[in-house]
Amino acid sequence: MRRLALPVTLTMAVALTATAATTAHAAPADRDHHPRDITRQVLADGDGWGSAGDGTTGGSAAADEDVVRVDTMEEFRAAVGPRDDDRPRIVVVDGLIDGNTAADGTPLSCADYAVDGYSLEEYLAAYDPEVWGWEDPEGPLEEARDASYRTQAAQIRVKVGSNTTVVGTGEDAGLTGVALQVHDVENVILRNLSFSDAYDCFPGWDPKDGNTGNWNSEYDNIELSGATNVWVDHSTFDDGDNPGSELPEYFGSKYEVHDGLLDIARQADLVTVSYNHFVERDKAMIVGNSDSRTTDRGHLRVTYHHNHFDGLGQRAPRVRFGQVHVYNNHYTLAGDHFQYSLGAGKESQLYAENNVFDLRDGIGAGEIVYNWGGTDLVAHGNAVMYDGRGRMSAVDLVAEHNALHPDRALGTERTWTPEYVQRVQPVWAIRSLPRRVGAGLL
């Protein structure tokens, strides 16, 4: 792979992370390739919210001709859609597929997407607050940035249809530079894949975001929007060769080129997220994307279990409206960018039990939770450890938060009890969880 050169020198002639594209045609997958056929596995009864309703079976009922192995971006795009085709399908990803690759296999760079004369140098010069002020950018350069963004979006955004299983084969299967969208569909399984570096070449400057303005990007590694019955399992989510710690700053703010790792929004419902590794993103995951979206009430029911949340800055997850069960996860809290892990937002109903929080770099137990306008959070059986070693000790997450933030105190009223749980393990069993999560293990 080639490393994407960030625009520290203010040039758009940079190449996105690329892998050598192969030219093999999509073909029926050999389901005997692996000693255990994971392509037709379904989410077990009682395994989190994703097992509720009609359950999550993905493409397990696919006919043999609808089981396809892919190793290029064009093959992948064709295999997972269209959304109006509800036939069960299984898509087996062989190797690493780079979203920034043309149909002929040519790697695409940010410069290839830039249109209408856009350049970062000119954008920075035009909208520097010392020149432009603190109003929203507008005019030909902002229009060119937006048009360039849309050109890239047409290439890297891929929509998944209903009744689909996408599964990786081997240790290195995955998607890089792809923004996978599971929108307004049902019954989708995503397993044994790396989802890496959905890089936005054209972040927009918002001078009114926060006290000093922020750069905002558009692409999540995966976005669930209006989707029902989804299982995301044994996958790895990261920034690939473009970690947030190495991004430059412009106008005093980090030039943020990533959005979320796995965002769940707009009445998405009945989701199980299990045995995944989420790595070193600032804003990792939201459940519900707006306080004003009251139509989310009664939806956004999500279970997170046996995941490793590793070096994330915030939103692991941040919840609005939904009933969200967070159990048996391992959190590694580290780094200067850390803000909080569990965010209790408007009308959130977070239920956190038997999780391990490994506190590093001086991070305290009172920083694990933050109240973003919520009322209550139920938490029991959780434990902390320090710097990856020593004995674990019980922690009252709400009491620790309230002691640190008495002006934003949370209650502990239980408004619901999780039903779809196979077994909650004792917290001591979660200490070794990190070695059992992520892609390449199935």
Region spans (language model):
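Right-handed parallel beta-helix
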Residues: S162-D172, E186-Y199, D220, G226-P243, ...
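Extracellular beta-rich repeat passengers
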Residues: R318-L442
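Extracellular beta-strand-rich solenoid/capping regions of secreted or surface-exposed proteins
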Residues: A78-D86, T101-T165, A173-R191, D197-D206, ...
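Long, low-complexity, mixed-charge
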Residues: H34-G59, S109, A114-S119
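Low-complexity, acidic Ser/Thr/Pro-rich repeat tracts that form intrinsically disordered stalk/linker regions
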Residues: A26-R36
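Acidic Gly/Asp/Thr-rich repetitive segments characteristic of extracellular carbohydrate-active
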Residues: D45-V92
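Secretory targeting and sorting signals
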Residues: M1-A27
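Acidic glycine-/aspartate-rich tracts in secreted/extracellular proteins
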Residues: E74, L96-G99, E171-D172, G362
